[in-house]
């Protein structure tokens, strides 16, 4: 079901391990292997769009449960509800900073960044599942005047599902292979520049 996600994680782990060398020939060989993974040099996977779409879907999924969660939290703590929007805003800023950081790390070919990106998506997805169950139980066993929580919980679950489907495509997999290729390339260039600087001395 999530074969491409597993493949991209496995590829990232293998390349990260094999990058631990200063041999430019081995790095060139790694680059060539990765070129075979991301395929044709022109396509959506070359633009960074796949990772950006995944990030946006994660943010949309999180946004769907924000207001209801903060309303519930403020009621439990006995805080005035007019301050809810302040809580929503601050939490959204922190969340966006976290998810954007994982996106940029993933775009640089970082295995840790990619694992964190998947962890953030998984955690957000679990929150949306809990929110979905809670809102629909409230609808079935309680008196509900406003159906907004049920609609937003359904949308949140939809965004989470779309994100998983999107990350499990060959386009997304090839975009991860490209980020790894570029990371290897950057390391190769650094080594070559260092060697050139040594020769000039």
Residue ranges and their predicted role:
Residues 5-10, 171-201:
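Short, highly charged, low-complexity non-transmembrane loops/tails of multi-pass membrane proteins
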Residues 9-61:
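Cytosolic juxtamembrane helix and N-cap/initiation of the first transmembrane helix
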Residues 36-44, 76-87, 141-149:
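Membrane-interface segments at the starts/ends of alpha-helical transmembrane spans
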Residues 47-53, 73-85, 112-115:
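Short juxtamembrane and helix-loop transition motifs at transmembrane-helix boundaries
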Residues 58-66, 80-101, 123-127:
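Generic alpha-helical transmembrane segments
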Residues 63-77, 108, 130-141:
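Juxtamembrane "helix-exit" motif on the non-cytosolic side of transmembrane helices
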Residues 100-126:
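Loop-to-transmembrane helix junctions at the membrane interface
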Residues 128, 135-187:
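Alpha-helical membrane-associated segments of multi-pass integral membrane proteins
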